[in-house]
């Protein structure tokens, strides 16, 4: 009987040691896991995610003309955001937006808060659906970010070309500027042209961005600047990173591109 008790005790000790070793091994495995994977899991929320550009999406961007042949922004520096957004009637939609990885997490968090608050965004599809045509896309009130292009008459990449600017509810928050002509006259520029009725910002209408509203506040808190604050022109749909930030990336990409070409 004593022998049986000793054997049972021995077996119990071996079992407990084995379990303890297994638990320690499991804890060690978690401790040594990829931090990025842990962060992704802890920050994940159904309907909101950021992804690297897949082969399928990359082909779509090339055929849709947002990633043009002369694009100097590396594919690996871009992220595709999948988010939920609500229209003015409270209907939920799945949106997608390609941005630079530098702003991906911030923009993802902004869209989460806008969705939770029911802030209306009518449409959010990639510019490739419009063959990267800005006017057509803006008339459709589409919200977007990355669309590669250089600033006119320069070799500088625009902020949308870097994926570091975001346009929201474009039809109802148009771009407006007066351009001086050689003869001293001025030409009024409104983009989209169909956005003219919404230049009067004293009026109340759906999808309007106002200084101090939730969309404005969230972007400003993340360090963006709003085109509605500009004095030489107005771009009510537009949020962008400061020039001192974007120029560093633009110069880096230009330098890398020049080295590859030489």
Stretches with model-predicted labels:
Residues 12-23:
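Bacterial N-terminal signal peptides
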Residues 121, 136-171:
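Mid-length scaffold segments of soluble, non-membrane domains
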Residues 84-86, 104, 109-120, 149, ...:
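Structured segments of extracytoplasmic/periplasmic soluble domains
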Residues 151-153, 170-262:
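Catalytic cores and adjacent binding grooves of peptidoglycan-active enzymes
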Residues 2-12:
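Bacterial N-terminal signal peptides that target proteins for export
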Residues 73-138:
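Active-site acidic/histidine clusters and adjacent loop/turn architecture
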Residues 33-91:
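N-terminal module-boundary/linker segments of secreted carbohydrate-active enzymes
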Residues 21-36:
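Sec-dependent signal peptide cleavage junction
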